């Protein structure tokens, strides 16, 4: 590769590398307060307080045996009930909430992706997942509802996308998972909320490739 072409590569790809580095530097700064809360009618609420990136709970709660390994990814503002395993031998309704406060980005009009996967052996049961942004930065706040996903299917994956105008910071994210047992069985669940990635990096990459093509044509003309 000639020196001119090498310089062109550096100039074309440089903005993409810089943008990626800036994103990683900003994303790695997330270390915010978050809480996991379990509730069922007739039982005292259980709350676990932590700091990103993880929170967990394991043991008996209400009419359920619970194992939750959740939290937030530190690479972007994402909250995740990533491994939620439940079992019960009686009917019951369990609510699981996860919330993070102190988020500073992204801002402006943002699309948010909510995802839910369900695998259970409890015929007649149902699971729902609600997501929300709260611009008052309140833990478990649901000021701006995003998506609601629900199903009575034993094996299914669901997703929903909704927009929210992040007009002020800091703000909070909240997930509310509701599990209704019809009489006994096991549940393996996963719920998450994260911003939909913007195509900015793809635009930069496209610009870089166009620049390389232009340099290549110019070099061929000079030969």
What are these regions (language model features)?
Residues 2-33, 182-210:
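Short, threonine-centered small-residue motifs that mark membrane-proximal processing/anchoring sites
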Residues 3, 7, 11, 15, ...:
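Residue-level marker of intrinsically disordered, low-complexity segments enriched
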Residues 214-223:
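C-terminal membrane-anchoring or membrane-association module
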């Amino acid at each position: 590769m000639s020196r001119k072409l090498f310089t062109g590569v550096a100039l074309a790809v440089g903005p993409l590398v810089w943008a990626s580095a800036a994103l990683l530097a900003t994303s790695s700064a997330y270390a915010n307060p978050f809480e996991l809360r379990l509730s069922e009618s007739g039982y005292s609420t259980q709350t676990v307080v932590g700091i990103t990136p993880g929170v967990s709970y394991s043991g008996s709660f209400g009419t359920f045996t619970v194992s939750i390994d959740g939290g937030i990814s530190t690479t972007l503002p994402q909250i995740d009930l990533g491994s939620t395993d439940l079992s019960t031998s009686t009917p019951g309704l369990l609510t699981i909430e996860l919330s993070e406060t102190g988020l500073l980005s992204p801002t402006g009009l943002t699309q948010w992706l909510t995802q839910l996967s369900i695998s259970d052996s409890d015929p007649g049961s149902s699971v729902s997942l609600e997501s929300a942004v709260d611009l008052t930065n309140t833990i478990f706040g649901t000021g701006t509802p995003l998506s609601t996903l629900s199903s009575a299917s034993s094996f299914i994956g669901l997703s929903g996308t909704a927009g929210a105008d992040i007009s002020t910071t800091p703000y909070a994210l909240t997930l509310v998972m509701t599990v209704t047992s019809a009489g006994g069985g096991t549940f393996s669940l996963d719920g998450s909320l994260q911003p939909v990635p913007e195509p900015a990096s793809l635009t930069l990459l496209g610009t870089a490739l166009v620049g390389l093509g232009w340099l290549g044509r110019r070099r061929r003309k000079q030969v």
